[in-house]
Amino acid sequence: MNIHYTTQFKKDYKRIKKQNKNIDRLKVVIEKLVAGKKLEPKYRDHRLSGNWNDHRDCHIEPDWILIYRIEDEELILERSGSHSELFKK
């Protein structure tokens, strides 16, 4: 499976690195998704609704999430960050 990083995800990734988050935790999740493995329950992987209804959300840490979707054997990484950063109204 190929990986596509959206422009917004790239910006999120830079912000996460500046926050000194453990990037290895994110890499582990991405590797599992690319391999087609089901994520363990601790990641709380689930479908989103509303404007994000064709996306999934999993928790890297309790308040650090990854929003992604899989289309035609391609993993598309959309966003990553805290709930307040990603879902602010």
Across the structure, where does each feature detected by a protein language model lie?
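Enriched for short, Lys/Arg-rich terminal
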Residues: 2, 14, 21-24, 28, ...
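Basic, amphipathic "hinge/linker" alpha-helix immediately C-terminal to the N-terminal HTH DNA-binding motif
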Residues: 5-9
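Nucleotide phosphate-binding site architecture
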Residues: 10, 49, 87
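Alpha-helix C-capping/helix-to-loop hinge sites
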Residues: 12-16, 55
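Secondary-structure boundary motif
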Residues: 15-18, 35
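Residues at secondary-structure transition points
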Residues: 20-21, 43, 55, 81
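A short, surface-exposed loop/turn module that caps and links secondary-structure elements
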Residues: 32-59
